[in-house]
Regions:
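Generic preference for hydrophobic/aromatic residues in regular secondary structure cores
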Residues: 1, 84-86, 138
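Intrinsic disorder/low-complexity signal
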Residues: 1-26, 30, 142-146
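Basic/aromatic-rich interaction segments and small domains that mediate binding to polyanionic partners
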Residues: 11-16, 31-78, 94-140, 144
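Short, intrinsically disordered linker segments that flank or connect zinc-binding domains
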Residues: 23-26, 80-87
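Short nucleic-acid-contacting surface segments enriched for D/E, G, S/T with interspersed K/R
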Residues: 89-92
Length: 146
């Protein structure tokens, strides 16, 4: 016998799900121009850019972008946000952009980075208080020298 499990119609798929509370990076667009990202997809360009850092130069759709890869000094087109991850500044005082959560779209400064936890201390522009933000919610921002 093949272990008669009653496999079947338990998982009914419903269209038009009303669960709006799913806060997953897979679905929420977080791409912005001028933020630093790392390529985490081994298949992207046959692995040539795997774990390489770059800067988003153009956001084409909410989930795809063109990235200038530092090491190769070239632009890779149409990378999906699933293929990328955020990069947090190494040093304190680095410019950051909130890419998710309550403060999405706001710029600020990295004050402290705790290597033992997944949180950083940031001060956003026009905010007096220091905020504790999750690493995935902030990203290094490339500020052009004026």
């Amino acid at each position: 016998g093949q272990g008669g499990g009653a496999g079947g119609e338990k998982a009914k798929t419903t269209t038009g799900t009303t669960n709006t509370n799913t806060n997953t990076n897979a679905t929420t667009p977080w791409l912005y121009p001028n933020i630093r990202v790392r390529v985490v997809d081994k298949k992207a360009s046959k692995g040539r850019y795997y774990l390489k850092k770059g800067t988003i130069v153009d956001v084409k759709t909410p989930e795809t972008c063109d990235v200038f890869i530092d090491d190769f000094r070239e632009v890779v087109q149409d990378l999906h946000q699933r293929q990328l991850e955020t990069v947090v500044p190494k040093g304190e005082g680095g410019a950051v952009l909130c890419v998710a959560g309550k403060w999405k779209g706001r710029q600020g400064t990295l004050l402290r980075r705790n290597r033992k936890s997944d949180y950083v201390a940031c001060q956003l522009e026009d905010e007096a208080e220091i905020l504790k933000l999750h690493l995935d919610d902030v990203c290094e921002l490339v500020v052009s020298e004026k």
